[in-house]
C-alpha cells in the first residue's frame, strides 16, 4: 500500500517493543537503530503536545549524523498529560503507584509527538487521545505495578495490559496512540510523502 516508500529505507529509532509491534502491523519494512542515552529532558516552559514534539525532534537530532542518503528516520515520544503536567516514565515503584493513584477516576490525555526525518527535510506531528480511568483501589494499583511492567511506560501504564482491561473506562481518539504510536496518523503521513 505504501509503494511510495520504496525509495526509502525506513529506520525506527526506538527501543519500544510496542512501537516495533505497531510498525510491523503496518506492514512496512523497517530496521531499528537505537542510541544508548538520548536526552529526553525538555524546557519547563513547554506545555502539552509541545513536550513530545520537542523530544521527538531532539531524538531525530541525535540520530542526524547516522541518517543515510536513502533513509527515512521515525522518532517518537509519548507523554501522559494530566492536570497541567506531563507524566513520563516512572522512576521507581512508588512513583508508578503515585502516578496511577493520580489517574484513578479521572481523565487524562496521551500525547505522542512523531518526527519523520531525512537528510533533506523533517515533518513532525502530534496525536492526542483522551483516556478516562475508572476508580482503582490500592490493591489493584499495587497488583499492576508488581506484576506488569509500568516502568517503561509514560504514565506508568500500558493500555494493552491488565490495567487497561480493568481500569480504562473510555478512550476518545487513537487506541494505538495510547500504546505509543498513532499508527493510523503515521500511515496517512507516510502515504503523503
From Swiss-Prot:
Give the CDD domains listed for this entry: Maf
- Tell me a GO biological process for this protein: nucleotide metabolic process
Which InterPro entries does this one have?
ITPase-like_fam, Maf-like
Q: Which Pfam families match?
A: Maf
Important for substrate specificity (site feature) positions: 18, 78, 160
What are the UniProt keywords, alphabetically? Cytoplasm, Hydrolase, Nucleotide metabolism
Instruction: Cite the active-site annotation.
Output: 77 (proton acceptor)
Write one Gene Ontology MF term.
Answer: dTTP diphosphatase activity
Task: Say which family it is in.
Answer: Belongs to the Maf family. YhdE subfamily.
- Read off the HAMAP family from this record: Maf
**Function, as annotated:** Nucleoside triphosphate pyrophosphatase that hydrolyzes dTTP and UTP. May have a dual role in cell division arrest and in preventing the incorporation of modified nucleotides into cellular nucleic acids.
Specify the protein name: dTTP/UTP pyrophosphatase
Organism of origin? Bacteroides fragilis (strain ATCC 25285 / DSM 2151 / CCUG 4856 / JCM 11019 / LMG 10263 / NCTC 9343 / Onslow / VPI 2553 / EN-2)
User: What lineage is this protein's organism placed in?
Assistant: Bacteria, Pseudomonadati, Bacteroidota, Bacteroidia, Bacteroidales
Amino acid at each position: 500500500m505504501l509503494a511510495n516508500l520504496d525509495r526509502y529505507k525506513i529506520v525506527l529509532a526506538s527501543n519500544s517493543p510496542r512501537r516495533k509491534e505497531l510498525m510491523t502491523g503496518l506492514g512496512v519494512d523497517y530496521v531499528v537503530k537505537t542510541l544508548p542515552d538520548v536526552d529526553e529532558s525538555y524546557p519547563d516552559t513547554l506545555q502539552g503536545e509541545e513536550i513530545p514534539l520537542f523530544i521527538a525532534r531532539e531524538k531525530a537530532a541525535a540520530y542526524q549524523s547516522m541518517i543515510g542518503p536513502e533513509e527515512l528516520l521515525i522518532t517518537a515520544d509519548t507523554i501522559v498529560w494530566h492536570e497541567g503536567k506531563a507524566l513520563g516514565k516512572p522512576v521507581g515503584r512508588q512513583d508508578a503507584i503515585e502516578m496511577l493513584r493520580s489517574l484513578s477516576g479521572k481523565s487524562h490525555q496521551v500525547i505522542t509527538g512523531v518526527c519523520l526525518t531525512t537528510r533533506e527535510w523533517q515533518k513532525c506531528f502530534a496525536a492526542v487521545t483522551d483516556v478516562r480511568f475508572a476508580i482503582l483501589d490500592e490493591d489493584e494499583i499495587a497488583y499492576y505495578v508488581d506484576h506488569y511492567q509500568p516502568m517503561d511506560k509514560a504514565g506508568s501504564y500500558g493500555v494493552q495490559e491488565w490495567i487497561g482491561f480493568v481500569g480504562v473506562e473510555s478512550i476518545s481518539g487513537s487506541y494505538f496512540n495510547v500504546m505509543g504510536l498513532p499508527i493510523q496518523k503515521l500511515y496517512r503521513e507516510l502515504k503523503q510523502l
